[in-house]
Amino acid sequence: MDPGLKPSSSWTHKIVDSIIANRSQTAVQNFRRQPLANKLTALEDAIVQPRKDSTPDSIAAILQELVSMGALKPSEVGPMFSDLLIRVHKYNSTNVQSNLNVLLGDIRAAQSEAIRSTNVGELSNQVILNDFLSRLPPVVPMGQHNYEAFKQSLRLMVNEAPNVTLFKSGPDTMMQVNIRGVNTVNLNSAFSNLQNLWGVVLDSDRVPGSISSKLSSNTRVLLLFLAPFTNENTFTPDTFLWQIMQLYRETVAASIEAPLETEREVAETVRDMGGDIDDVGRTMAYLLKNKEEVMANPRTLSPRQLGVVRYVQESLMDRIDRNGEEPIDALRNIVFSFAPSYFEANGSFIRKLLSYLEVALRNSPNYFREIYSNKYWTPPPSFWTQNYGDFFVEREAEAEREALEEAGPRESYSFLEDPSSSPQSSKIQSLGTCGMTMLRPMSPSVPPTPSVRSAPPSVSYGGPSRSSLSVDSASNRNFGATLARAVLPSAAAAIGNAAGEALYPSLGQFLAPAASLAATRFLSGNRGERIKRQRQRRRAEIERRRIAELTPPSPAPSLSSESSAPSLSSVRTSYTPLAGAKYWNPVDDPEGDRDVSGTGLGNPFDYLRPRNGLK
């Protein structure tokens, strides 16, 4: 070793002394003659000291104790010590445990460093919010669903809003929101203020001032901040919290429901190219979801609204099917069945429901009957959007035929014996003499022109008119039938109940409905036969109408002095519409407007037609 080289430190001097003892020349020569592997092993042992492990000593002590007790033979100790040492070192040695502990420490240090390098604010918000929610009671006396939904809405706001900070101020948890200034809310105070309001149920669409006045300003600010993170299905319908959050959502709707810039740019581009943005939306919906229409978020009825719907259905079924009232009269008179206080509290929904039913009745009688006869019916999306295109698909002829079948025994069947006396056939004949075909009924209130002589419809030469007698007799029959249908089923039910109770207790509740049903069927009589005959007459009338359309009109007879006076049937009666009324001209407009009033004039519900202009 060069005497000029000196150890750079005491640690180096110590390592060299452990390899070459006393630094003698003999020791240096001996180390030099060693193989390279021995030199490397000596250096490794000197630089990296092996960890002390007491596992072999522990195993040897255990085996020695077993030999001294006579449980093991001395010849068995060697192989057993070897196997145990290998197994312990492989699976459960102190060396392995120490290495694992070191590895876990390194992982914890790396995780802590990664967390410290991320957003500390969001992490602290989660820690503080979890601590606050863990201190709240898990169960409340009433309104558990609203209680849990409110906590989830608060967590959603803390997770999603970037300008929210939570911090502790003594025993209270504070939430600071930076929106148009700094707003601080005390969460402990807000939850304490709401503890008695979670399950409050309202019986109207308005929030009583006696309840809303209990909200503190701190709580109102929290409700305003949480409103954008809720929807109509978050809380239980008809509860105070559901109603007040709906008001706050409407307050902030202008700022949170603004269309996105991308959607606005696409809409402007489509309009500039002359396209329809609605068609583009339906096309995109079909490409993305394989559906042509983009359905809005489903809206569910509250228990109070569902009760209104079921009550209206039962009332319509009782008025139309049992009492024999006309559907339009039943709809107009059903509002008198509600108590004034109840109608005042729920008037907006009742008026909306009745308006929907009236439009359905005028445009699709089949759909109207399905509405009031199906006890599981709930309003479709068109009820909320006021786009009534879902029941405009029924054709007018089908609607008229089904409406005629639905009327059944309530109408006069005097014209079934003579089809020429029916009002519809007389209108078609009068229109055929004028030289044009018009399938829509004319208005009975339109008078003939004074220049043309025509006889009154109720006057007939040689005796009273058959139509006048049929009208009088039909009105009397309808009145008697209506009175019988209104009284006899109830009386039969009462008699059946009394007879059943007299025979056996609690038997009356089964006999009463059966007696009422039997009386109703007895009063209906041969309604099926009458409807069948009416269908046949209707079919024959349609065939005659088609034949009349294919047959060219006969020329009008020339009037001369030698000819006799023309008969009333040969006189061409012309009709003029009332002043200011919109009249349908089949020449200018072959399709015409949908006549739902039966007057031949304009459609009074034209403003309810969808924007795409369904016929």
UniProtKB/Swiss-Prot annotation:
Pfam families, alphabetized: Hex_IIIa
Q: Where is this region: Peripentonal hexon-tethering domain?
A: 1-92
Describe how expression is induced or repressed. Expressed in the late phase of the viral replicative cycle.
Biased region (Basic and acidic residues) positions are 400-409, 539-548
Sequence positions bearing Phosphoserine = 212, 451
Record-linked InterPro entries: Hex_IIIa, Hex_IIIa_N
- Source domain of life is Viruses
Q: Where does the protein principally reside?
A: virion
The entry's comment on post-translational modification says: Cleaved near the C-terminus by the viral protease during virion maturation to form the mature protein.
| Residues carrying Phosphothreonine | 262
Which residues does the annotated region (Binding to hexon-linking protein) include? Answer: 124-238
One GO cellular component term of this record is: viral capsid, decoration
Q: Where is the composition biased (Low complexity)?
A: 419-430, 451-460, 557-570
> Which positions carry the propeptide annotation?
602-615
Its localization reads: Virion; Host nucleus
Region annotation Disordered: where it falls in the sequence: 400-473, 528-615
Its keywords, alphabetically, are: Capsid decoration protein, Capsid protein, Host nucleus, Late protein, Phosphoprotein, Viral genome packaging, Viral release from host cell, Virion
Q: Where is this site: Cleavage?
A: 601-602
Question: Quaternary state and partners of this protein?
Answer: Interacts with hexon proteins; this interaction tethers the peripentonal hexons to hexons situated in the facet. Interacts with the penton protein (via N-terminus). Interacts with packaging protein 3; this interaction is required to promote correct genome packaging.
HAMAP family reported for this sequence: ADV_CAP3 (MF_04047)
Family, similarity comment? Belongs to the adenoviridae hexon-linking protein IIIa family.
Q: What else is known?
A: All late proteins expressed from the major late promoter are produced by alternative splicing and alternative polyadenylation of the same gene giving rise to non-overlapping ORFs. A leader sequence is present in the N-terminus of all these mRNAs and is recognized by the viral shutoff protein to provide expression although conventional translation via ribosome scanning from the cap has been shut off in the host cell.
Q: What is this protein called?
A: Pre-hexon-linking protein IIIa
Record organism = Snake adenovirus serotype 1 (SnAdV-1)
Q: What is the lineage of its organism?
A: Viruses, Varidnaviria, Bamfordvirae, Preplasmiviricota, Tectiliviricetes
